[in-house]
Amino acid sequence: MGMALELYWLCGFRSYWPLGTNAENEGNRKENRRQMQSRNERGCNVRQTKTYRDREADRHIHGIACLLF
């Protein structure tokens, strides 16, 4: 059971879990907006950190790779 849960977590299916994702999304959206505003004020709008969407995409790619191999 523990191994199955670990694989479930590693393969990125946490993103399909319905609880708390909207709040997570909203929080990340606000944080990204805040970061972009502060970067624009400093005059460097190059994105240095991964956004929630990037991490989500990585997790999905990892999940698909786990299923295939």
Curated annotation (Swiss-Prot):
Source domain of life: Eukaryota
Biased composition (Basic and acidic residues): 26-44
Segments of this protein annotated with the region Disordered: 23-46
Name of this protein: Putative uncharacterized protein PRO0255
